[in-house]
């Protein structure tokens, strides 16, 4: 993971490094990761997700990033592509507005493993979406998706690692009640800009 961390245009905070260490341990474990990452908007959750995606792809897996809106999907696509292109990691975008011919091509490339990271909206939940080897599912703004929807995307892989991210502050006790099956990481310091 140090390759991608060193290529980031900013230094990671201590909290980001701690969260990445937790995620790294989870991804190395026999048990699939099931982690909630909570942090304010701008706290660097996307950078953490990019590093986790890099690790998954370099370990031979595909990554699905599911977000609630096409605008956010496009934003993530630009960020992931910018950071991962230099490592020959192919990132693609799939939203409901994707042209039919382009969508068919992406679905085929996803199925054959030519796409490493797919970023999309609810479009990723469609029945005809198949992965070659899905190993990591990241759901951003997880509260905007139901349990069933998250279950659909998770079932497209064979026990993939799961990372759900939220900017909505969730008191730890409530988080344990609502997401008792998840390990919880809270980004508790602001990312330095510049």
What are these regions (language model features)?
Residues 72-109:
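Conserved helix-turn-beta segment of the N-terminal RecA-like "Helicase ATP-binding" lobe
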Residues 97-118, 128-134:
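Conserved motor-coupling elements within RecA-like helicase/translocase cores
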Residues 40, 68, 167:
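P-loop (Walker A) phosphate-binding loop of NTP-binding proteins
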Residues 60-61, 88, 113, 194:
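Glycine-centered short loops/turns at secondary-structure junctions
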Residues 56-64, 85-86, 160, 183-186:
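Post-Walker A helix-loop "phosphate-sensing" segment adjacent to the P-loop in P-loop NTPases
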